[in-house]
Curated annotation (Swiss-Prot):
Any single GO BP term: arginyl-tRNA aminoacylation
GO molecular function, one term: arginine-tRNA ligase activity
Transmembrane segments: none
UniProt-annotated location(s): Cytoplasm
Keywords: Aminoacyl-tRNA synthetase, ATP-binding, Cytoplasm, Ligase, Nucleotide-binding, Protein biosynthesis
Protein name per UniProt: Arginine--tRNA ligase
HAMAP family the UniProt entry points to: Arg_tRNA_synth
Listed EC numbers: 6.1.1.19
SMART domains recorded: Arg_tRNA_synt_N, DALR_1
Reaction catalysis annotation: tRNA(Arg) + L-arginine + ATP = L-arginyl-tRNA(Arg) + AMP + diphosphate
Species assigned in the record: Ignicoccus hospitalis (strain KIN4/I / DSM 18386 / JCM 14125)
Originating gene: argS
Length: 622
């Protein structure tokens, strides 16, 4: 166990034992929630709030902490002093003892790794295969990839999956548009997902415009949309308009959906060919940002295998299905307070019945998602399944958990996590799917590279400037997406994302390169010759280094990559202050020089490890 984790665990055990002797049974986990680093060094290095226990025992807070201080003193390795400060019981660690252990730990390649044993599935990205990945998908992908890394670092066995939604209306609209154009393949030299995105936008506008169910006002709006699309892609619009001769294109789209769901060989071949081409574009972008997925799951395979029909039949057998206007609807019969609590459903939130099958016999996304969730749990024998899905999908995700519960898959329902995230806004740019206005991830990366190149060209020490530009650009975009808590929206501002002086990936990458540069000049530290007796001056930074494993563990337990981002920025600030004040390579005192070099190496390794958990590469030269 790591030095700070071990010290905290031993400290909390002694407190729990002392409280037990007074008749209070307190779990170590409960005490851990009340533990933390005191606000000032004078108060100690680790503390626990005991106010609530003093109240339960009918004691004044300072009375309880004073008693416990006497019982704990002399029983903890590495502790210089136990301090009772009001209702807080704190410990101050011996600097030389802490430094020797923490700096040795932090020099290891796998620093911050744990050995939790669990099996987890993380489904992320899962974009509709009809257009390129955009900024919203980017946040999804980078959060998902970071969760995979953080959970693996925790020691879990993790599988990442991408759900290919090939049975939705959007893919059918794209295929319909392509059939009208008379060609399925993208033009030579154009990235496939980008071309298909154009075709989809035009086809969707024409389907809506020519739909008999649309009123005059709606048609006027779609005419405006089509004009805007024509100004961007005149050839596609003109060519498709000429061939758009169906009286009711919406009915034709529905017919394509139905035929695909039924497994019509010709339609099946067409859909699969188109979707695979779009996925090629996705994979190219994902490779560019270093994101891999273990398993690609086709929605259609679930239907053709009969798994979705099994779900519908099971619901019928349990008396959960009613027929409404020809559609099959699942009603939730057991939505009581206990179920709401166990499935994390807010009190008072109305949950409508779930349509399983339309009147035309086709199934809906959430119906298929029930079968897919069971598949994810059973194929991987997962303890938990985490779905990284936008916050706006909150209701369908609640319906999914409820459906699993009603069908008897109670354990799956409780262990299915909707990892919700909010929108990404880029000032001065508006996204509109219907107007084909998309801030694509490809564009964002190109623009990041262009801006980074302007900043580093002529000033970079690296031999391969192109490689540095790519790493910094990708890292900057990734960090911007994962460093903000997922429940908060992001405003993506270039001046913040590419700030080399604070609060960004380039700042952390630059700090890492600076630390590695010092080690190039000063050499590797000799940990046996380091003078740990002089560690007092650097204790704050040593404590921060020692906190990394705990931060990595908490990020895994709470599913919060932003905790790592916040921690790294704080550590980098402390290191840069140290860098400006302290000579390292030129330090004449050998013992002190080795101590400082050990500090620099520990910071470099910690930043490298932390950035890796966020999916960001750390170049050795900038």
């Amino acid at each position: 166990m790591y030095v700070l984790s071990e010290t905290k665990s031993n400290f909390l055990k002694l407190i729990a034992e002392a409280l037990k002797r007074r008749g209070l049974e307190v779990e170590e986990e409960e005490l851990e929630r009340l533990a933390g680093r005191p606000p000032s060094p004078e108060m100690g290095d680790l503390g626990v709030s005991l106010f609530r226990y003093a109240k339960k025992l009918g004691l004044r807070p300072e009375e309880l902490t004073s008693e416990l201080k006497g019982e704990i003193e002399g029983r903890l390795a590495g502790v210089k002093e136990v301090k009772a400060i009001g209702g807080f019981l704190n410990v101050e660690l011996e600097p030389s003892w802490l430094a020797e252990r923490a700096l040795r730990e932090a020099s290891r390649e796998d620093y911050g790794k744990w050995s939790f044993s669990g099996r987890l599935v993380v489904e992320h990205t899962s974009a509709n295969p009809v257009h390129p990945l955009h900024v919203g998908h980017a946040r999804n992908m980078f959060l998902g990839d970071s969760l995979v890394r953080i959970l693996k670092n925790w020691g879990a066995d993790v599988q990442s999956r991408f759900y290919i939604n090939d049975m939705g209306r959007q893919v059918a609209v794209l295929v319909y548009g392509l059939l009208k154009l008379g060609r399925l393949e993208p033009p030579e030299g154009e990235k496939p997902d980008h071309w298909y995105g154009k075709v989809y936008s035009v086809a969707n506008a024409l389907v809506e415009l020519n739909s008999p169910s649309k009123g005059d006002d709606e048609k006027k709006e779609w005419e405006e949309v089509l004009k805007e699309l024509e100004s961007k892609w005149p050839e596609i619009v003109r060519e498709m308009k000429e061939k758009f001769d169906d009286e009711d294109p919406e009915a034709k789209v529905s017919e394509l959906m139905k035929k695909y769901e039924e497994g019509d060989p010709e339609v099946k071949e067409t859909f699969r060919k188109v979707v695979n081409e779009v996925l090629k574009g996705f994979k190219e972008t994902m490779e560019r940002v270093g994101v891999n997925v273990d398993k690609w799951d086709w929605e259609s395979d679930l239907v053709w295998s009969g798994e979705v029909d099994k779900i519908i039949n099971m619901a019928k057998e349990k008396g959960l299905v009613i027929e409404k206007d020809g559609a099959l609807v699942m009603v939730f019969k057991n939505l009581n307070d206990e179920v709401r609590r166990r499935l994390r459903i807010p009190k008072g939130l109305q949950i409508p019945p779930l349509v399983l099958k339309r009147s035309d016999g086709t199934t809906l996304y959430t119906t298929r998602d029930i079968a897919y969730t069971i598949k994810k749990f059973e194929e991987f024998r997962a303890d938990r399944v985490i779905n990284v899905i936008a916050a706006e999908q909150r209701l369908p995700q609640i319906q999914l958990r409820l459906a699993l519960w009603e069908l008897g898959f109670k354990e799956y329902a409780e262990n299915l996590i909707h990892y919700a995230y909010e929108m990404v806004n880029v000032p001065g740019m508006k996204m509109s799917g219907r107007r084909g206005r998309m801030i694509t991830l490809d564009w964002l990366l190109d623009e990041a590279e262009r801006r980074v190149r302007e900043l580093v060209e002529g000033r970079s020490e690296a031999e391969d400037v192109d490689e540095v530009v790519k790493k910094v650009a990708v890292g900057a975009v990734k960090f911007a997406m994962v460093s903000v808590s997922p429940e908060k929206p992001i405003t993506f501002k270039w001046e913040e994302v590419l700030n080399f002086e604070r609060n960004s990936a380039p700042y952390l990458q630059y700090t890492y390169a600076r630390a590695v540069g010092i080690l190039r000049k000063g050499g590797e530290p000799d940990l046996e010759r380091a003078d740990y007796s002089k560690a007092e001056k650097y204790k704050d930074m040593i404590l921060s280094i020692a906190e990394f494993p705990e931060v990595a563990r908490k990020a895994a337990e709470d599913l919060k990559p932003d905790l790592i981002a916040t921690y790294l920025l704080s550590l980098a600030d402390k290191f840069n202050e140290f860098y400006h004040k302290e000579p390292v390579a030129k330090e004449p005192d050998e013992g002190l020089r080795n101590l400082k070099l050990a500090l620099v190496k520990a910071v470099a390794n910690t930043i490298r490890r932390g950035l890796w958990l966020l999916g960001v590469e750390a170049p050795a030269r900038m």
